[in-house]
A protein has these predicted regions:
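Compact nucleic-acid interaction/catalytic patches
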Residues: 9-53
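C-terminal terminal-subdomain/extension
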Residues: 56-100
Length: 100
């Protein structure tokens, strides 16, 4: 079962793409068949390469909350890790700042 903060591979693509689930627990529990996500890029990118990113230490990678997307829950595979509550909060703050 997908939960808030999970990092999961996309199963609707031929490429190896990962996303982090930004939907809160209420949205996930509502079981709408959709979740709010953003891309997760495995590995490190240079600190000055992009603005509005969130660095993740385990698994090592970067969230791109500026590129928020709705996906069907069925498009996600088994989670490979989680971003943690601090990183999830930071990503949600970036998304909120972009639309307020």
């Amino acid at each position: 079962m997908i939960t808030s903060g999970d990092i999961a591979p996309r199963q609707d693509s031929n490429s190896e793409l990962y996303v982090a689930v930004l939907s809160n627990s209420i949205h996930v529990a509502a079981n709408t068949g959709r979740v709010i996500t953003c891309p997760f890029i495995p590995g490190r990118i240079p600190d000055d390469a992009m603005a509005m990113v969130v660095l993740i230490s385990e698994p090592v990678g970067t969230l791109l909350p500026e590129l928020v997307q709705w996906l069907p829950s069925s498009a996600l595979g088994e989670p490979i890790g989680t971003v943690g509550s601090a990183a999830l909060g930071e990503a949600a703050s970036i998304v909120a700042a972009l639309i307020s």
